[in-house]
From Swiss-Prot:
One of the GO BP terms on file: DNA synthesis involved in DNA repair
Subcellular localization: Cytoplasm
KW Membrane (keyword) present: no
Binding residue positions for ATP: G31, D32, N33, A34, A35, G36, K37, T38
Primary location recorded for the protein, binned into one broad class: cytoplasm
Listed GO MF terms: ATP binding; single-stranded DNA binding
Name this polypeptide is given: DNA replication and repair protein RecF
GO cellular component: cytoplasm
Free-text function comment from the UniProt entry: The RecF protein is involved in DNA metabolism; it is required for DNA replication and normal SOS inducibility. RecF binds preferentially to single-stranded, linear DNA. It also seems to bind ATP.
Family classification: Belongs to the RecF family.
Source organism per UniProt: Hydrogenovibrio crunogenus (strain DSM 25203 / XCL-2)
Keywords, sorted A to Z: ATP-binding, Cytoplasm, DNA damage, DNA repair, DNA replication, DNA-binding, Nucleotide-binding, SOS response
Length: 362
């Protein structure tokens, strides 16, 4: 099973140093606003993904007047113990797995399958397709070992093609990249479409559990990044070559993929209330967690920042029951302990954080 046994951090945001030994179920971090609760969630997410969900400027993560931050986790995965670490300075990142240098962040992410729910998560429905692609590709990455390699090949070919388009290089040179782009895009399309097909029944199940008042089932409509009416992606590139050259970039492809969520043919964003939108995102994450567990025989780890801001008391309890049922280790933050029901005390741990200092509650 995937669990974080211990997590240590140094010089991350306002936290000088902290060490937490987590329980198997609920792990609750309680504190006032700006005490450092979100920084702990952010630190675990950064170890798992290599990036923050709060800033695109990594140097902001390093504590003021310090030159380096360090994150370290001891994990269980399929009954094996792994130790992973990340050290970051203003211009360098060092990754280690079991004492050896890791080649890529993807190697770290594969060891630490973490999902994230924050007060901003409902934007998955509101904003452009980038967040929905990231959601989909998290699942594809963990579900299909070929996906990350195909995505890298695609990104490399796309970068080279776009560079050639901007430089107005001869058509023969630009089109050299088309074959690589098409080959990777078509394989990525198959993986993504298959993943969404597998995900949808679980989404239906968790929508019913969290929103029984909605009697119609959700639908997931995957869009590959080019019109379905096109004869083929290869032909579409050829037909739009002049326009791509004029604009200096590739209009169509896997980098434009999206998912549309609908109920009875209507956009989810249009018919769901703000509260229901948050529940829908919870259902998406639970569906993804279940599919991951079915595939890997290991549960994910769920990070939830400020759960009371996300859900009312009734739905908080429902969500926590589902997380326990799925055997998902969940790490939550809240401004008050009594806002979070402790359903399985023997698997739970609670901390209070003040000014970046953690105190475990007995």
């Amino acid at each position: 099973m995937s669990k974080i046994l211990q997590f240590q951090l140094q010089h991350f945001r306002n936290i000088e140093q902290a060490s937490l030994t987590f329980g198997e179920g609920l792990n609750l971090i309680v504190g006032d606003n700006a005490a450092g609760k979100t920084a702990l969630i952010e630190a675990i997410w950064t170890l798992a993904s290599g990036r923050s969900f709060r800033t695109a400027k990594p140097h902001q993560l390093i504590q003021q007047n310090q030159s380096e931050l360090v994150l370290f986790g001891t994990l269980t995965e399929a009954d094996r113990i792994h130790k992973i670490g990340l050290a970051r300075t203003s211009d360098k990142v060092t990754l280690k797995i079991d004492g050896e240098l890791a080649k890529t962040q993807a190697d770290m992410s594969a060891k630490l399958p973490v999902q994230l729910l924050t007060p901003e998560s409902h934007r998955l429905l509101e904003e452009g397709p980038k967040a929905r692609r990231q959601f989909m590709d998290w699942g594809c990455f963990h579900h299909n070992a070929d996906f990350i390699h195909l995505w890298r090949h695609y990104q490399r070919a796309l970068k080279q093609r776009n560079h050639a388009l901007k430089k107005r290089l001869p058509a023969s040179q630009i089109q050299l990249w088309d074959a690589q782009l098409v080959d990777a895009a078509e394989k990525i399309d198959v993986i993504r479409a298959d993943y969404i097909t597998r995900l949808t029944p679980y989404l239906v199940e968790f929508c019913q559990a969290l929103m029984p008042e909605i009697t119609v089932s959700p639908e997931c409509h995957y869009r590959p990044g080019w019109p379905k009416t096109a004869e083929s992606y290869r032909q579409l590139l050829a037909d739009n070559f002049a326009k791509d050259t004029l604009q200096g970039h590739t209009q169509y492809g896997s980098h434009r993929a999206d998912i549309k969520f609908r109920f009875n043919g209507q956009e989810a964003l249009m018919i769901l209330s703000r509260g229901q939108q948050k529940l829908f995102v919870c259902a998406l994450l639970l569906a993804q967690a279940t599919l991951y567990q079915q595939h890997s025989q290991n549960p994910v780890i769920m990070l939830i920042d400020d759960l009371p801001a996300e859900l009312d008391a009734k739905h908080r309890e429902t969500l926590l029951k589902l997380l326990n049922l799925l055997d998902i280790q969940h790490i939550l933050t809240s401004t008050a302990q009594d806002l979070i029901p402790v359903l399985e005390p023997e698997k739970a741990k609670i901390w209070r954080i003040q000014h970046g200092e953690l105190i475990e509650q007995q």
